[in-house]
């Protein structure tokens, strides 16, 4: 989710963790730079796949200043998707059934792929595993085997609204993964915006 007025945005839907300890990595700030997705390691049962890519520029387009359990948050200098902005759905608007994810897979541009929202958990103690998503799109299944590392933060879209973002893949079934409610990420953005205003005043 991105606020077109302030440039504040949230990404990933989960935190960036230390690979050895699995603990959240501390972060003061960081640059946001463009990347190009150049290849895919296909996911299969018991072996997570991944997107491969490289930094396509060293010119920062924004900065990150929060790494939390529910994603990374920062501010963009210019919105890359301002003309394609979609409204955010409240969690009660999300329904089981057909949806799409918007993701980039080794061909340069983000594409829509069909998925099914299999289940919705409103009371889950984890705020990042609210939805179970099944990839049904034959093109995406052929390219990636389903959900792979690097797809975190891919928007989940239903009825013209952003309902969530992909957060995790099922280790034993790469066609399935979890998603976070977009509303949860927006709540975090609102808190960040309020803190920013308070600091400024």
Predicted regions mapped to residue ranges:
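C-terminal recognition in membrane/secretory proteostasis and scaffolding
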Residues: 1-201
